[in-house]
Amino acid sequence: MAPRPKGTSAGPKLYEERRLELGQSFQDGGEHYDRVRPGYPADSADWLLPEGARDAADIGAGTGKFAALLVERGLAVSAVDPSTDMLTQLRKTHPQVIALEGTAEATGLADSAFDVVSVAQAWHWCDPLAASTEIARILRPGGVIGLIWNQLDTSVPWVHRLSRIMHAGDVHKPDFRPVVGPEFAGLESHVTHWEDPVTPADILELVKSRSYYLRANDPTRAKVMGNLQWYLFEHLGHTEGEVVPLPYLTQSWRAWKA
């Protein structure tokens, strides 16, 4: 995401407008997003879930990448996303999930109905305080909020440069700590390092699912693709069809309803 504009009065307003503008870039392209975006490691869900959890809500669910892990663990899952296109894809791949249009700030879900609420790869599009209030409303007493991000592992030098070319704005700084509202306590984190086996063509398609690329004009898109092709094929020497282990880390956060 673009850095927060500096300033006193104009800055927050401009940042909010930019956040909403970038978020709109995911309204379409559910099939492509589902095909090219990675899933999440199993232990990110295992660590997140409270003992005895039965009912889960996945907010900003997209095409159901994280919801799939919840279903595999036997939970009844309700998924909420503002994109009709994303939910259409989710219903195709996970018909057992209840899929509803809504946002983290207005889910439309019932009071005190869930043991855990997950927000994977989406909290940065939300108003964290308003979303915290809404999520606390739908959680049962002692319920857990989980915030999950997949990001490229930029501690690996070649991946760091790749992320710069991709304009991967979701790579967090080491001191990153998400904002949650006063409804929650005991915020703690968990990190999983893993690799996704991909081809250079997969990486090129992955870039096309990023908000920076989706909102860019044609000349900017062409420049990004040209730089990326040079980096993968000429600088790194990869070939078409070669399987490349792409290092990721998944950063998970959880807190309990106070």
Describe each PLM feature range:
Residues D55, T63-A106:
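Class I SAM-dependent methyltransferase SAM/SAH-binding core
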Residues E105-V116:
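A short acidic, Gly/Pro-enriched loop at the edge of an enzyme's catalytic core
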Residues T133-V198:
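Conserved catalytic/acceptor-binding region of the Class I
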Residues I59:
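Conserved beta-strand/loop positions that form the S-adenosyl-L-methionine
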Residues C126-E134:
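A short, conserved alpha-helix within the catalytic core of class I
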Residues Q121:
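Short catalytic micro-motifs in class I SAM-dependent methyltransferases
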Residues P3, V179, E183-A258:
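Conserved Class I S-adenosyl-L-methionine
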